[in-house]
């Protein structure tokens, strides 16, 4: 095994989902974008399909792969459409698309869609003053509006959450005046843990995979561990330890087959003594040749060492890595 392997616990993902669903008390739209945050979208979706109302992905390509895998649930594409090709593929695979602006709405003709509302994050969405016009345009284009959603930009800020919730509720009421069965959803993992308004559904992402966005805490279980193999033991010669001068004199070093080419940060971590190599890192001590070593079991702790978030670590490390599923 020359490359690291990610061991993903589907049992833990299901347990995390149960916890979040209990907190929210409404159906779940499970976010499996970016290959389920690096955990493998098809495998994760099959494991939790019986527990969710719908899946959400980033792109039409991601949605098409889920449908082709036979996950048996509707799939919402969160990124607005930008081309006729997107629209054709969305139609072919029966995807639910996002209409977030008048240009994106134009590509949604005849499609099932959720309207995105910009309540303060300023990423995607119609502004509240555009909702009435958007509904008129949707009717002209025969868009089948099945939902309306927004996103909390700082779920730990109670004042901001209150303002966004109020704005969203007003916009959702307008949408429901034209489409009474439109599903309203606002809260992702942070919003759920903050006790935000659940409306008709919630959209957990990070929490499914075992992490609460700071500053929240919850009894979630990280679902991915990454293992790398000892590929050499070295009696040190000269002054290096990987790509750096050794900080001290070593009596023994070993090399693991994991580096920044596998999504880890070049600056270090994983117990490395120097900067990581592309496909390897050097650590102190001696371990039997071929030993499997866990190099990542807490993405939040690893992220904190590098001034980033668990989101970035999971997506970077999980991307393209061989995965073994447990439970």
Q: What residue ranges belong to the model's regions?
A:
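Active-site-proximal beta-alpha core segment in soluble small-molecule metabolic enzymes
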Residues: 4-15, 23-183
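Active-site anion/phosphate-binding pocket segments in diverse small-molecule metabolic enzymes
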Residues: 1-10, 14, 28, 62, ...
């Amino acid at each position: 095994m020359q490359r690291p392997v990610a061991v993903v616990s589907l049992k833990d993902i299901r347990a995390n989902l149960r916890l979040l669903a209990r907190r929210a008390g409404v159906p779940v739209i499970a976010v499996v974008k970016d290959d389920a945050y690096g955990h493998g979208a098809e495998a994760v979706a099959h494991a939790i399909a019986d527990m969710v109302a719908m899946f959400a992905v980033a792109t039409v390509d991601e949605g098409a792969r889920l449908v082709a895998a036979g996950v048996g649930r509707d799939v919402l594409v969160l990124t607005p459409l930008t081309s006729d090709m997107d629209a054709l593929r969305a139609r072919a695979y029966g995807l639910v698309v996002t209409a977030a602006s008048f240009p994106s709405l134009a590509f949604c003709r005849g499609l099932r869609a959720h309207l995105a509302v910009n309540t303060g994050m300023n990423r995607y969405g119609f502004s509240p003053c555009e909702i009435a016009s958007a509904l008129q345009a949707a009717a002209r284009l025969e868009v089948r509006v099945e939902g309306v959603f927004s996103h909390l930009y700082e779920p730990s800020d109670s004042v901001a959450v209150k303002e966004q919730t109020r704005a969203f509720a007003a916009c959702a009421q307008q949408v429901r005046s034209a489409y009474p069965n439109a599903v309203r959803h606002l809260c992702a993992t942070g919003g759920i843990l903050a006790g935000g308004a659940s409306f008709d559904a919630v959209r957990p992402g990070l929490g499914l995979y075992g992490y609460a966005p700071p500053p929240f805490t919850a009894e979630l279980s990280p679902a991915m561990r990454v293992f790398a193999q000892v590929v050499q033991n070295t009696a040190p010669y000269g002054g290096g330890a990987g790509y750096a001068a050794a900080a001290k004199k070593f009596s023994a070093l070993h090399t693991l087959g994991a580096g920044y080419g596998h999504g880890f940060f070049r600056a270090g971590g994983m117990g490395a003594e120097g900067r990581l190599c592309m496909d390897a890192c050097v650590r102190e001590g001696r371990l039997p040749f071929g030993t499997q070593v866990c190099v990542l079991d807490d993405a939040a702790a690893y992220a904190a060492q590098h001034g980033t978030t668990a989101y970035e670590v999971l997506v970077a490390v999980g991307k393209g890595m061989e995965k073994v599923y447990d439970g």
